[in-house]
Amino acid sequence: MKTPRFSHKKRHRSPRAGDGDHQLRPHPITTIQAPQKSRRGGESGAADGADECLPAVVEWEKILSEWPPLEWPDQPIRPKAPSLRDVVEIRLLAFAGTVAVGSFFVWMFNPDHRGDAWLFWPLALSLAYNAVWWLMEWSNYARPKIEPFRAPRREWTVDILTTACPGEPSGMILRTLLAMKAIRYPHTNYLCDEGDDPVLREACRQLGITHVTRGDRKDAKAGNINNALQRATGEIAVVLDPDHEPSPYFLDRVLGNFEDPGIGFVQSVQAYRNQDANFIANGAAKQTYLFYGPIMIGLNAYGATQAVGANCAFRRAALDSIGGHAAGLSEDMHTTMLLYAAGWRSVYVPEVLTRGLVPETLPGYCKQQQKWACGSMDLLLHVYPRVFTRLTIWQKLHYFVAPLYFMRGLVALIDVIVPIICLAFGGVALHINMVSFLGMYAPAFLISTIARQVAQRWSIEPHERGTHMVGFVLGFGCWWSFLRGILCALWGIRLPYIPTEKMGDRQDCWGLAMPNLIAAAACMVAIAYGLSRDWSPYNFCMAGFAVWGASQLLLVAAIGQQRTLEKMRETLARIPAFLPVVKRLRKILIAGHARFV
């Protein structure tokens, strides 16, 4: 199916009243004044064809109280540029780690060490998966490149677009619209409203924002944006997710990079405002810290920066050259691959210029990961081969390895099943003692851990440093959502594009917990049977691995039962001795309706 082309008419205009001064200066969003309630009449920013009925009521005071705007620092935080010592240290670690990984696999694949083939090869796949990710991380750590700030030297015409879908909280979208309006650099705002919501339409009229809707939902988010691009005429098109609130200086920090005519897009950090809401939000955020920090800084050096769908600025000519935003569940990666194949380059700005939301509920997180897994694997199978010859060597490597991230679901399943089989059926994956195995595997694992800590010296924000175990446990416990997404891509099952639920009601998700409960029960049965049959050190090691896996599965299964946990909290709250425990449970496990600033 041929993607439509878009007209691109260059325009020149002077700043509008309300656009604001585009000089970089303190301007916290908290100074935004809600528009005054107006009656019929007056200029409207709504799309053509708006009805002549009385406008819907926009309760600005209620919206701002429920969705308070962020306060921004006068200048964005930039990570410290890596010193020569940092680079030398990380490269030495990368070299040592590569040697350790190679030595381990040469030793492991010794024919004398191989056990039962039906256990050895799945275990080898699991270990190889970890090794590939270590090598990918180290290659990016070894060449960090932080671009210097470039102020815009000319006036650009800019369109900022965000989307709205039925079911998304209108307050969240309206807060983003207010923040878009407060961006100081002159620009034109667009709301791409799939549902033609009357409240959003009226808010756009009051704010002077162009409201665009359409009669169908073809190509989901990409089609929604492309529909608005047919009306927009700016030289730069910025795409914001509706939950991402931009800073007033967003455009000031990215536009200067477009002075190079070969730059097709500029991506900034995807940061969050609710990462401390609960265990799920914290884990989901921590899964991204390394990617948006040291890894993307390294990809920038290799010319392989990835557009991530939110807070990305595109040169309009670049988008037009590929027929607009590419469609799909991973439309951001698809668009990136096509832009690189067309010869465009990119810049990564390692600054927090927007803050959004991560899922706070288990259903929201699992649906998001399943969608990304299916979309990324579909790109690897169908798009990557078509653009392969037009990508650079590092782009080829990254866009081959990146979709494999979602194979972690299969790897987690292997990590659970192998100990179960060894305990229940006496299978042997490796004919070696555990001390020898740990002695060969530990160097690579330790180097990986140390390298991450060194690379975190140029993390974006201080709270992004650490071991990120919460993110690992959450991903391990949601193995089936990754695996289901991969299988849907392999079998050609089309998943609908559904916006990720970021905040939901307290509810129990026993259906989502069943895969974990079944796997954990199998671990417990295998441990009991295996140890009753054989008390050998080997069986004790397998039992240890089974306990480790089952504990993670049960923890994530428990966290998904929001209503039950809330009832437990209310019961324990009646007992004074349990008040400290109750407060801790509420902080870690319970996803409430509060908005975390």
Regions found by a protein language model. Give the residues of each.
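N-terminal signal-anchor transmembrane helix
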Residues: 114-118, 128-186, 568
